[in-house]
């Protein structure tokens, strides 16, 4: 895993919006920062909150904790729980088609645009 991180242009850490997941996320951030120091060039780190349930206190507090700890590294939105995506993953089937109107797919599209925008900004700064 370390060799892959050393060769990477970006580290994206998808993190379930639950308290226990925050421990693993913090470890991945520390590992990314260690790799960045050893390779002597930036390794942009992006944190993507996933499986977010806005109805629960644990989900809301976990999202706030991510934002407090990691600031602009955290996507300002979150991927909501989407049962169709979860069920399809369990069956190893494609979850959605282009015509699927679910909130989960729309959030993944916004996340992709955010990541691509971050990469474009990084390229502009490097030039």
PLM feature segments, named:
Residues 1-77, 83:
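Conserved catalytic-core segment of NTP-binding enzymes
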Residues 33-36, 112, 116:
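Generic structural signal for well-ordered alpha-helical scaffold segments
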Residues 39, 92, 116-117:
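Glycine-centered secondary-structure boundary/capping sites
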Residues 73, 109-112:
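H/E-rich (His + Asp/Glu) clusters that bind or coordinate divalent metals
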Residues 87-110:
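C-terminal boundary of histidine-terminating zinc-finger modules
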Residues 115-123:
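Short, hydrophobic alpha-helical segments
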Residues 126-127:
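C-terminal accessory region of SF2 helicases/translocases
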